[in-house]
């Protein structure tokens, strides 16, 4: 009886067929995922420049906001702490100024102060739709000379550190030296106390018991050597 012979199929074709039957469908990549904005980041429609500014007090800084389209009004938001929500920035006349030219909006702050520290966001609201786009933010850090209160605080801190160092020196250097000196003095006193230890006072001879040494007569005359006869 003739047996049925299976046609030889390459193993890699079978593996590929099994993978196609068992694998989940892979979603097609969207065009916006393939072509990301090279100038910005996750804030797709608008981006800010620079992302961080550090200037001394009294300088003038500018923050730029670039947009894909010029349609819509641009406003600026500001928050001082990271965990706060951005609030509408109140422009001070003569010191803060905002300008918009087609796809570029600029915020200018003159004579920056410590109160201007924070993160600034540009926000665009389109005219045709209700969509609102917000930039990633620009952090401003104002640097300058310390105030009188800060100087006093630093001086107090320095005095405290010096006091702590002095106490540590006394504790770890001077105190051990005094302890060693005190130990040496006590050791010398103990040696003096043990000088007459074991001596029985009752058995010692008194002054009257001391026998007077009497010298005998000399057998040789002056000038004669004792070895001569």
Swiss-Prot record:
Segments in the Extracellular topological domain: 29-159
Highest taxon in the source lineage: Eukaryota
Record PTM text: Phosphorylated on tyrosine upon B-cell activation by SRC-type Tyr-kinases such as BLK, LYN and SYK.
Cellular component GO terms held in the UniProt record: B cell receptor complex; external side of plasma membrane; extracellular exosome; IgM B cell receptor complex; plasma membrane
UniProt KW Membrane keyword: yes
PROSITE patterns: IG_LIKE, ITAM_1
SUPFAM superfamilies per record: Immunoglobulin
Domain notes: The transmembrane helices of CD79A and CD79B chains and two IgM heavy chains assembly in a four-helix bundle structure that appears to be conserved among different BCR isotypes.
Name of this protein: B-cell antigen receptor complex-associated protein beta chain
Native organism: Homo sapiens (Human)
């Amino acid at each position: 009886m003739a047996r049925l012979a299976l046609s030889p199929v390459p193993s890699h074709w079978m593996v590929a067929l099994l993978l196609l039957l068992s694998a989940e469908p892979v979603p097609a990549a969207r065009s916006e995922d393939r072509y990301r904005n090279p100038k910005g980041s996750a804030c797709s429609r608008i981006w800010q420049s620079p992302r961080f500014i550090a200037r001394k007090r009294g300088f003038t800084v500018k923050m730029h906001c670039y947009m894909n389209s010029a349609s819509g009004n641009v406003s600026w938001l500001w928050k001082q702490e990271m965990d706060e929500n951005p609030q509408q920035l109140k422009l001070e006349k003569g010191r803060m100024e905002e300008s918009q030219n087609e796809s570029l909006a600029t915020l200018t702050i003159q004579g920056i102060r410590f109160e201007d520290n924070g993160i600034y966001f540009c926000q665009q609201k389109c005219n045709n739709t209700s969509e609102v786009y917000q930039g990633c933010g620009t952090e401003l850090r104002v640097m300058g000379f310390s105030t009188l209160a800060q100087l006093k605080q630093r001086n107090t801190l320095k005095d405290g550190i010096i006091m702590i160092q002095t106490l540590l020196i006394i504790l770890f250097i001077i105190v051990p030296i005094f302890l060693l000196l005190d130990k040496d003095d006590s050791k010398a006193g103990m040696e003096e106390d043990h000088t007459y230890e074991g001596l029985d006072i009752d058995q010692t001879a008194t002054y009257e018991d001391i026998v007077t040494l009497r010298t005998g007569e000399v057998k040789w005359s002056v000038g004669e050597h004792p070895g001569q006869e």
